[in-house]
Amino acid sequence: MALTVDVAGPAPWGFRISGGRDFHTPIIVTKVTERGKAEAADLRPGDIIVAINGQSAENMLHAEAQSKIRQSASPLRLQLDRSQTASPGQTNGEGSLEVLATRFQGSLRTHRDSQSSQRSACFSPVSLSPRPCSPFSTPPPTSPVALSKEDMIGCSFQSLTHSPGLAAAHHLTYPGHPTSQQAGHSSPSDSAVRVLLHSPGRPSSPRFSSLDLEEDSEVFKMLQENRQGRAAPRQSSSFRLLQEALEAEERGGTPAFVPSSLSSQASLPTSRALATPPKLHTCEKCSVNISNQAVRIQEGRYRHPGCYTCADCGLNLKMRGHFWVGNELYCEKHARQRYSMPGTLNSRA
């Protein structure tokens, strides 16, 4: 439907456009501001702009059409082509991408809700008319033995693993009611879960007395994870060696050598690591073992750095050297006092 709209000015006009020759689409009104000038002139989203102020907009670029609309004098005359039914992708303030995203999210939410409802129905306690996917199914109506409503007990997988007081099976045994095996009938859910009922007078045990599960079933995997989680933690090799050494020491034996992973002896053989430490030198002046730095005077003769002094004045000879007079060490000054001739001095500078 062709029509002409006059929008009273001045700019801004209160609407947005999209398309153009560079987009290979006609120029279309995409949004109209509420209570604006364009809305007052009955401009609607989805209108195709055919001409702007009498100039054809068929070959206009998008920027060119925007410029002509912004710089137009009042009133702005637009020739429109309005369809009878609004396009589903053109709504006020909502582009086609937004509409599609909203619909896609809604469909995802609906699909997720349906899956959760199916999952809850599959794992929910047994109702009066159980679904075929439930492993806890009652005998078919054609079976000669059928349990009454009072004899039905619902039990989900969660109650099977976390509620030891509850016991469920594909056929439940009660006093006065023969089982399906006694009646000669078998159910296709024999391979699902079979749990023997606990005695009413006996307290419930955390472990089931009899449990047959398929290895690829979810309940079997859940029980395996719980059993592995309760297992004792493994000891490392170093901790085990340390524990054995402490136990040997408590028994009065010789503790085994446990090298640290950071020590230099960790990579050495055991015989070398347990070897006796090297022999320490003995100071010839104070007759004490030298545990750190030693001054070598002659072969087999050592002194502490503090004991390497003049026998007369006590001056340290480390930076000066020593002179032998008999069997004593002297500095040069006191050694010359004991000899009139310097040539007789025995210098060890």
UniProtKB/Swiss-Prot annotation:
Modification Phosphothreonine, positions: T138, T142
Keyword list, A-Z: Cytoplasm, Cytoskeleton, LIM domain, Metal-binding, Phosphoprotein, Zinc
Domain of life: Eukaryota
GO biological process: protein catabolic process
GO molecular function ontology, one term from the record: metal ion binding
UniProt region (Disordered), positions on chain: 74-147, 169-212
Induction: Regulated by IGF-1.
Reported function: Probable adapter protein located at the actin cytoskeleton that promotes cell attachment. Necessary for the migratory capacity of epithelial cells. Overexpression enhances cell adhesion to collagen and fibronectin and suppresses anchorage independent growth. May contribute to tumor cell migratory capacity.
Entry protein name: PDZ and LIM domain protein 2
Organism annotation: Mus musculus
